[in-house]
């Protein structure tokens, strides 16, 4: 059995080829590279396309579907629209359309939004959207890897999304625009609200630079800013403050869910959550009274492949989310 998992992230696309529960290869394409090259031609270097049994696809916010759905049944790529979601480059759209046109069997993973009824109704009442599709994939990877039925997952990268899993189902959480900051994205505060109202900046532009990048002079574009800030942690006072502030912010978000997390299991993921120098997970552990573990690697792409594999093996529910395939 051969499956492929797709993670549509802020800086690009990551794909995982898995055969019989074993990861065979992982490759990445920056969004700018995708605009100039065929994703499927790149994938073909790693696997015969005719041998793929199923692909698990993440795309954008996933707010137009509420089930893990056969790509043939999905309209408008599974989104309501592409507004208000951060910087748009177009690479993910090109990859999605290539996959759909190829007739390779595929399922599209939804985001977590108020239409997903398996979550606690209070979170759906509070927030219109909680997470994009790859966060479900990361959660499922953590669920399968560590075997926890109850845990908090915090994915820290360009943005930070923190989710609570109870009894093997996603209970709720905090989206990138609520609560903790990431490197690029974060919640909109009073100053940004004023700038939006005075038409100095759009709400989407404000969100896209409301992360700790606002503390530094280090914006190097969507793909390279995190490396600029993290590599200068010990050299630049603004970068030091930015990273320390991110750690504080994420720790606050995790701790805000701990009263619902009686097993006290916490899993950190994402390029910043797994960053070794400075060691972000160790810095966060100092602020958390619990069992803090790290999910290394390309957890979103691997998790998408795990979802595809388990669907082929007959699963009709993933972390409480129904499967329509």
Swiss-Prot record:
Intrachain S-S bonds: none
Report which superkingdom the organism of origin falls in. Archaea
Cross-referenced NCBIfam families, in alphabetical order? methan_mark_12
Q: Name the protein family.
A: Belongs to the UPF0285 family.
Q: What is this protein called?
A: UPF0285 protein MmarC7_1666
- The source organism is Methanococcus maripaludis (strain C7 / ATCC BAA-1331)
Q: What is the lineage of its organism?
A: Archaea, Methanobacteriati, Methanobacteriota, Methanomada group, Methanococci
